[in-house]
Each structure stands twice: as structure tokens, then as C-alpha cells.
Amino acid sequence: DGSSVDEYSATVPASFSGQTMLAAEALVEEYPGPACSIRFGGIYGRGKSRLVSRLEAGEICPHEPAVISNRIHSVDCCRIFMHLLRRYQAGQSLDSIYLAVDSQPTPLYEVMQWLANKNRIPLASLKQGAASARGGNKRCLNQRLLSSGFSLQYPSFKEGFSDR
């Protein structure tokens, strides 16, 4: 539906994997020591991406209905772990949950269109494939993470996919 969500938003996952992740977060909350959960978006990084492979195979996701893509570069994933560990070691409090995504939730079609242009794959040559069944089609907000003092090296998919 494209609505925005953050760590305070209600979570009612329909998929098995989403339900399993929520159950794991509940176990983390029960842990008697300091702990937090990190909800990573779609992780990508160096090397060939699944999206580029899909484009090279002649397929692009449908333009409609728009499916929101929340991504995070693998380098930023590691940096988030280090940031939160340093906060803990410095005696600073941690929130119970962080959304770890970049600052630009974007319709997947736009991401794939940008990647096709970057990789010189003519859009006219692409056929619409199946819609993505992943994720909940929400715009995940990373304000809690940024408010903790973290700064993204790759604030959007454009910086992340350009650094290849």
C-alpha cells in the first residue's frame, strides 16, 4: 500500500518468514542482558545483483502496482553493527529495534529502470516479469537509526549501485 512504517508501527506479518522473524525478536526482548534487534531491508553489495541478472535476462518488474523497495548496502550493514556495538561499549542506551534501510525507499520498477540505464540495457528490450512477492510494500523509515548518530555511506540505491 506504500504507507510509511517505523519501529513503532504494528507488525502483523502474513508470511512464515515474517512470523519467524517476529518470534525471534520476541526472544531477543526476553533476553536478560542488553540486546536489540535490527530489521535489515534488502541487502545488496559488490558483485552482480539479482536485479541486474534479472535485467540481463530480459525481464523487469511490472510498473503497476508499484512495489516499494527498501534496500541497504552490505557495507552499511556492517557499519550499523559496529555503530551499535560502539554505542553499547560507550555506555549509551540502545533501542530495542532498529530499521536498517537506506534513506530512499523507492518503487522497485524505478530501481530496475535506473539499473537498466546504468548498465546500458535498453528498456524497450525488457519484458514485464512477475510482481515481487517479497516484503510488505511499505516505506521503511530509518530515522531512529540516524538519530542514534549513524550516517549512511550509501544513503540510496544510486550511491550503492554506483560504487561497483
What is each PLM-predicted segment?
Residues 133-164:
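C-terminal amphipathic/interface module of NAD(P)-dependent oxidoreductases
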Residues 1-15:
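Active-site "gating" loop of Rossmann-like NAD(P)-dependent oxidoreductase/epimerase domains
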Residues 80-83, 87-131:
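Mid/C-terminal beta-alpha module of Rossmann-like enzyme folds, strongest
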Residues 77, 81, 100, 111, ...:
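Non-catalytic, hydrophobic alpha-helical segments
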Residues 16-28, 74:
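Conserved catalytic Lys-bearing alpha helix of Rossmann-like short-chain dehydrogenase/reductases
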Residues 24-46:
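Conserved beta-loop-beta element that borders a ligand/cofactor-binding pocket
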Residues 19, 37, 43, 48-53, ...:
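Substrate-positioning beta->alpha
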Residues 52-64, 121-125:
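A short C-terminal helix-loop "cap" of Rossmann-like NAD(P)-dependent dehydrogenase/epimerase domains
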